[in-house]
Amino acid sequence: MTGPARSGAAIRGAGRTVARGLIFLIQLYRHMVSPLRPATCRFVPTCSQYAVDALDEYGLIRGSWLAAARLTKCGPWHQGGWDPIPERPGCRVNCQDASDAWAVRATRGESGSLV
């Protein structure tokens, strides 16, 4: 690998490292700070678990975006409830691989590129 391909791989590797660091900090919060406070999260999974899942599944950029969007829902203006991370496009319960993920083009309003 040379040139842009190599630098792209290095950037992805650095992103994974930073995402792992954020997950470590969230886990520290969950095990050191959160037990000292009363349970107030109105969502399932909790916001911290959601952030860990999003960073693990989608990586640094999109995972951070999803976690930040979830935190904006925190407050009395949102009723809470079940709110898991979104599925990857094209993957369903019985999905064995992602080879068919881009077979069908998304229609207007179905693109997952912004969130």
Swiss-Prot record:
It comes from the Bacteria. It is found in: Cell membrane. GO terms for cellular component: plasma membrane. It is a peripheral membrane protein. Keywords: Cell membrane, Membrane. Signal peptide: none annotated. NCBIfam families: membrane protein insertion efficiency factor YidD. Could be involved in insertion of integral membrane proteins into the membrane. Belongs to the UPF0161 family. This is Putative membrane protein insertion efficiency factor.
